[in-house]
């Protein structure tokens, strides 16, 4: 299995090519690839009545995976914890400013902008799951189906 590392190029010049640092643990990697496969499968089966049960099952799987990631983000290993990379709006602004200055802040793992994207994707996945559940159970109006499809295509 390949390992995700912090870039050795980011080390100070006097440290040379020291061994890279392991960042993401196995649960985060498994979560990531199960989410990718579940989303791809759900997306590919979205328009088929024949594969509707698989589509729904993959959607529920994604919601379960988000639940797992939230728990692991609170109790997991050091770099898996949200507290290690979620820095709030001020951190995102500071990081983006450092990009525009041409001197980006170095972060092991996710930078604050990446953390914002992760939180948005987890929330979007929950919205897709909730709207999908409502569509599948005929709860609500037609706009919920539009929301479900629009969020998945976003």
Question: Where does each model-flagged region fall?
Answer:
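Membrane-embedded alpha-helical bundles that constitute the cytochrome b-like, heme-associated redox core
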Residues: 1-154
């Amino acid at each position: 299995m390949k390992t995700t590392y912090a870039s050795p190029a980011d080390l100070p010049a006097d440290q040379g090519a020291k061994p890279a640092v392991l960042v993401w643990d196995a649960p985060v990697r498994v979560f990531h690839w199960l989410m990718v496969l579940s989303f791809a499968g759900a997306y590919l089966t979205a328009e088929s009545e024949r594969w509707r049960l698989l589509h729904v099952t993959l959607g529920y799987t994604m919601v379960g995976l988000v639940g797992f990631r939230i728990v692991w983000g609170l109790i997991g290993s050091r770099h898996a914890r949200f507290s290690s990379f979620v820095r709030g709006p001020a951190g995102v602004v500071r990081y983006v400013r450092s990009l525009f200055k041409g001197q980006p802040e170095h972060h092991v793992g996710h930078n604050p902008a990446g953390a914002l994207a992760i939180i948005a994707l987890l929330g979007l996945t929950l919205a897709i799951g909730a709207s999908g559940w409502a569509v599948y159970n005929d709860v609500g109006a037609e706009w919920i189906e539009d929301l479900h499809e629009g969020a998945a295509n976003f």
